[in-house]
């Protein structure tokens, strides 16, 4: 999850892209973390939210207040307020749009009213993010995990791929060996085409979650041969879009129930271990959600799925 300042516990509503949320420490702490990781041969990637900001971000607040100050019927002028073009404002109340109080304007916020969507048609916004990327690379970051890449333009894969192509090329021009992984939550037949962007990896959602291919195989719903065929089919499809792709298999994440709760009965612990082993043995760069190695449980509300790491045997107390 993101480490930047935010109004929420999950930090996906960023208020400042060039700082650390005080709950996690300081920039000095982060520098120490990166340095110590690098000494041990560990690379550091950070969660990067490009689909939306917080409604409390300076960009949005400036644009929102500018629209509130416009005379009725007047059109916004980006020369007067560049930030008004950083977001998607409309006089039509479309799906996922919310009112700008005191005006006849609406803004897009597909995930939540407090997370307004960014407008990736805007070149100045791209310049802003190029500077933000450089900021984190200067601190030694080795790559980025891009959140919700399928929603930059909801339902328009080609436009999403174009943004990712720009981002990949921009980052690699600054750090050739940077690692980029994207979250495009869908079936593999959809996110496979996103490899056209040149991005290194995309999370392999087809194998994840309580009803994914791994869990269904462990439960005996699918046989071993079907599991093997799924591996071959996905790898062949990804390879048809990119000859440099690195699969990003995972078993569960912060939006899913934890895997220790997928199974019941006398063999549940063994099944949990088997599922995680299958994930780690897939080709590519496997991701392990913190706490999975301990058998942490959590389901239902998002807060339960994102409980703090158990650092000691009495953590539950």
Regions inferred by a protein language model and the residue ranges of each:
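Active-site and adjacent substrate-binding regions of carbohydrate-active enzymes
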Residues: 1-317
């Amino acid at each position: 999850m993101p480490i930047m300042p935010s109004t929420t516990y999950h930090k996906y509503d960023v208020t400042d892209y060039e700082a650390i949320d005080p709950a996690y420490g300081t920039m000095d702490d982060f520098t120490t973390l990166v340095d110590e990781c690098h000494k041990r041969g560990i690379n550091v990637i950070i969660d990067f939210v490009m689909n939306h900001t917080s409604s409390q971000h300076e960009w949005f607040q400036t644009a929102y207040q500018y629209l509130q100050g416009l005379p009725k019927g007047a059109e916004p002028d980006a020369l007067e307020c560049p930030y008004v073009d950083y977001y998607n404002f409309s006089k039509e109340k479309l799906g996922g749009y919310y009112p700008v109080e005191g005006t006849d304007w609406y803004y897009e916020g597909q995930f939540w009213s407090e997370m307004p969507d960014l407008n990736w048609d805007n070149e100045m916004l791209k310049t802003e993010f190029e500077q933000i990327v450089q900021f984190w690379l200067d601190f030694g970051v080795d790559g980025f995990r891009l959140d919700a890449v399928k929603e930059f333009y909801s339902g328009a894969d080609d436009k999403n791929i174009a943004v990712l192509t720009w981002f990949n090329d921009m980052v690699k021009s600054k750090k050739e060996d940077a690692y980029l992984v994207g979250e495009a939550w869908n079936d593999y037949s959809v996110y496979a085409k996103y490899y056209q962007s040149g991005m290194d990896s995309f999370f392999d959602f087809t194998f994840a979650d309580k009803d994914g291919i791994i869990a269904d195989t462990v439960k005996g719903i699918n046989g071993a041969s079907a599991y093997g065929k799924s591996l071959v089919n996905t790898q062949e499809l990804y390879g048809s879009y990119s000859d440099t792709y690195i699969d990003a298999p995972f078993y569960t994440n912060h939006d899913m129930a934890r895997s220790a709760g997928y199974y019941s009965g006398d063999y549940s612990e063994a099944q949990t271990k088997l599922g995680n082993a299958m994930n780690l043995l897939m080709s590519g760069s496997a991701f392990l959600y913190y706490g999975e190695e301990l058998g942490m449980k959590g389901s239902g509300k998002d807060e339960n799925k994102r409980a703090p790491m158990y650092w000691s045997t009495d953590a539950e107390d």
